[in-house]
Amino acid sequence: MNLTDLKRKTAADLAVICQDMGLEGTARQKKQEIIFNILNARAQCDAIYGEGVLEILQ
């Protein structure tokens, strides 16, 4: 599960993910806040990996 996949999901899909993860109080939150809560919960129990290009300017 990565950020791009979460952004593509509907609010209903995100609510199901929250329910599966045991997160409560997300029914009245904005989509971005729900995504943050999902990623925050994942960070607490797993590692979060990022990928991309790092440009070093000198």
Curated annotation (Swiss-Prot):
GO terms for biological process: DNA-templated transcription termination. It comes from the Bacteria. GO terms for molecular function: ATP binding; helicase activity; hydrolase activity; RNA binding. Keywords: ATP-binding, Helicase, Hydrolase, Nucleotide-binding, RNA-binding, Transcription, Transcription regulation, Transcription termination. InterPro entries: Rho-like_N, Rho_N_sf. Its EC number is 3.6.4.-. Pfam families: Rho_N. Homohexamer. The homohexamer assembles into an open ring structure. Belongs to the Rho family. Facilitates transcription termination by a mechanism that involves Rho binding to the nascent RNA, activation of Rho's RNA-dependent ATPase activity, and release of the mRNA from the DNA template. This is Transcription termination factor Rho. The lineage of its organism: Bacteria, Pseudomonadati, Pseudomonadota, Acidithiobacillia, Acidithiobacillales.
